[in-house]
Amino acid sequence: MTIDTRQLGRVDYLPTYQAMQDFTAARNEATPDALWICEHPAVYTQGLAGKIDHLLNPGEIPVVQTNRGGQVTFHGPGQVVVYPLIDLKRAGYFVKEYVYRIEESVIRTLAHFGVTGHRVAGSPGIYVRMDDPFSHAALSGPVHPSDPFRGLGKIAALGIKVSRHCTYHGVALNVAMDLEPFSRINPCGYAGLKTTDLSTIGVSASWQEAASVLGQKLATYLAP
């Protein structure tokens, strides 16, 4: 069964969040899986593990409490957000592999633009070397005991929810954003974690191009 890919454009977060929940509650064994690709106006979203003290200074940017895993993150213009709505039972893999496949899709998307993405154990999402994001060298050596992200910038965030073996929420890839709002939070609960985007590391890519590539990679890697 093919994945139904939908380009939603720029849409408010709250109605999209509600639509994901409604889709998941209403779907049955015959419902095709879907990828919703969109962009949101500026908003902070809190995951179930989120702590209020990680919201340092949200200012006028709204904060939405959600039921996804993880902690606080920021969505805004210039970021590609993809919500995979996948029946894991039908797909034939479990949550851990699902997360791995999403991360692999981001890594392959970055590779399309010549950038090397990295995983950090225990910290879902994808990171790049800030000193040389195009280096193919693997991360090596022990991580710094007090700063496992030293030298890295987070370029993609991941947060999911699984209900009746069906997924919603998803992944956000930073393309060309105003990164200042990330400085007002501890991204994903980590104080001082640097956040970056493709533009900052020297990649000139349009939102539409990045969205198209990421959508294609997810459709490929999330297939059964």
UniProtKB/Swiss-Prot annotation:
UniProt GO BP: protein modification process
Site (Lowers pKa of active site Cys): K154
GO cellular component, one term: cytoplasm
The UniProt record lists the keyword Transferase: yes
Enzyme's top EC category: transferase
EC number of this enzyme: 2.3.1.181
Active site positions: C188 (acyl-thioester intermediate)
Pfam families assigned to the protein according to its UniProt record, in alphabetical order: LplA-B_cat (PF21948)
GO molecular function: lipoyl(octanoyl) transferase activity
Compartmental location: Cytoplasm
Superkingdom, taxonomy of origin: Bacteria
Chief location of this protein within or outside the cell: cytoplasm
Reactions this protein catalyses: octanoyl-[ACP] + L-lysyl-[protein] = N(6)-octanoyl-L-lysyl-[protein] + holo-[ACP] + H(+)
Miscellaneous comment text of the record: In the reaction, the free carboxyl group of octanoic acid is attached via an amide linkage to the epsilon-amino group of a specific lysine residue of lipoyl domains of lipoate-dependent enzymes.
Assigned protein family: Belongs to the LipB family.
Role description: Catalyzes the transfer of endogenously produced octanoic acid from octanoyl-acyl-carrier-protein onto the lipoyl domains of lipoate-dependent enzymes. Lipoyl-ACP can also act as a substrate although octanoyl-ACP is likely to be the physiological substrate.
Record protein name field: Octanoyltransferase
Native species: Polaromonas naphthalenivorans (strain CJ2)
Gene designation: lipB
